[in-house]
Amino acid sequence: QAHLPGLVILACELIDNNGRELENCVRRYAEQWQLGADFARWLEAKNTFCNTLVDRIVTGYPREEAAEICAKIGTDDPLLDTAEPYHLWVIEGNFEQELPLQAAGLNVVWTDQVAPYKKMKVRILNGAHTALVFPSLLCRVETVSESLKDKDLAAFLDCCLHRYILPTL
């Protein structure tokens, strides 16, 4: 096994240090399944488990549009899913040559540390969404998009971002 090439593994669970956690899981299973010392050495020497931050809202199976989408793609897909257009994938490591994800049109950031990006995401995006929930519901507005079209809600969010959220970074 030592002669086999390794893998670059991109963990996508939304937990801190997801690459390290996945590596620990793989090591435990390798031990439980008695894959041996050669496998353990190959795993250690040839493979990289990257920590990542994935930011994209995935809304689930598109029940109302599923038939139309399946007809368009020419197959039934019971695992069909929908997602918002915005996406960000922050990956710890330097594998841009091996994985030219940006060339495929993905919004990817290669970095030495995911943590600062997570801090920004949690504070700015999650903070803004949290700040909008109750005022928006009181105004009978159900989506962020609708909230941003309302001048009073947009002004409220702008104030929250500039006065309270951004100064914490």
Predicted regions and their residues:
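Substrate/ligand-engaging "lid" and interaction regions
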Residues: 1-169
